Amino acid sequence: MKVFDLHCDTLSELRRAEMRGDGQTFARNNGHIDLEKLEKGDYMLQCFAAFVNLADPTPGADPLVTALEEIDVFKRMMERYSDRIAPVYRPEDIRKNAEAGKISGMLTIEEAGCCKGSLGVLRRMYELGVRMMTLTWNHENELASPNVVPGNGPIWPCMPNTETGLKEKGFEFLAETERLHIIADVSHLSDKGFWDIAEHSTRPFAASHSNCRALAPHCRNLTDEMIRVMAEKGGLVGLNYCAGFLDDQPSPDLCRSTTALMAKHAAHFKQVGGIEIIGLGSDFDGIGGKLELSDCSKMPLLADALRKEGFTEDEVEAIFFRNAQRFFENNL
């Protein structure tokens, strides 16, 4: 069965591997995602995020440089393995690549703070191929506030930020991303920021890697009200495989990442927002711990868990790739 994944942090890992010179490549590596595993997993499309940590302690770290270097990794991947994987810039590219027997790669950004508040840089990111973007990661920036409250680290589960959302520059970025047809991604955005986008957006938006707060009460997850609004607006949510966003335990160390829990979240999404809202957003190469889905080649395990949860074969296909394919073909 084909797979369409809305989020991974593989570019960041590959950039670090190049800096270390340890021989890890996109063709084959020890992480969750490489080309060999994607082919084994029968992937239709993988979204690759250029991830930036605004609090990077590396001396001289520049968020824009980091993002551009990760985008350069993506470009070189697409060029070197062009017989096996190809980029997506336009809606029709997804089908064209599939018909050519190639996996699709879509470039995204996780932390629009790398643009340093510049609409010119944002437009340049579009020209480089970026087609989806979170306004924040876990740190405040010129655009908006994240869903992690400062000083919230020792608290479990992490409580949501309901007080601060998009700033003036954030609203400008939202308008420009919509004009460019860059998908606004609300994963990592504060609750207030979510509602700002829900109120002011004119196009469908995504939560590329978030789960259900009703099942796992973490600030990174969506409330039922958020799920309903996203469904009404034609949005898309990617199931996140991170244990802390799947399980409801008194300590993060006790949380599990299992396909059964993923299927429970999928069932809740379906109950609240309908089957059409659900996609996959693994967060592979950005999450740790013991994962039942130990890498991207193991996706049949999740398909089996969804069937056991009561999903029909058509619904499993909708979650695995059809919903996401439709969403991007309609909105890029």
Model feature map: region roles:
Residues K2-D5, L45, A86, S104-T108, ...:
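Structural preference for beta-strand elements that scaffold enzyme active sites
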Residues G117-E127, G151-A206, C219-K233, A260-E276:
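Histidine/acidic residue-rich metal-binding segments in metalloenzymes
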Residues N240-Y241, G273-C296:
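Short acidic/histidine-rich active-site segments
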Residues S294-L332:
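Mid-to-C-terminal alpha-helical segments outside catalytic/metal-binding sites
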